Amino acid sequence: MPLTPPALAVFDLETTGVDVATARIVTAYVGVMGVDGSLVASRSWLADPGVEIPAGAAAIHGVTTERARAEGRPAATVVREIVDELASRSADGLPLVVYNAPYDLTLLKHEAKRHHAGPFVPPPV
């Protein structure tokens, strides 16, 4: 049990591109912050998106196609885990902070549909 009560959850994605309908998740992060700003819990993912990661995207987040294939987990597994993690944080009553929420949450919705990860219902942002 954390010593600091959780206050909010944070979420971020790095992807293969900018089109929310076609880009794929490469990395994801969910953190839980305490009321004092401390990190209470965190979880991160590296996915093999199943497609080539363009050089421009790799230059931004540092993950190449080769690394994703060698070290990443299957995209369908990663997407299901992200959706489950966000649902859990929402069930905890935590508001979600997302730097570029329209992009990240819409892309996750498309990925959830693509990988049959159940309906993704974004939590309060």
Language-model features, listed with the residues they occupy:
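Class I SAM-dependent methyltransferase SAM-binding "motif I" and its flanking Rossmann-like core
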Residues: 125
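Conserved non-catalytic scaffold segment of RNase H-like nuclease domains
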Residues: 1-122
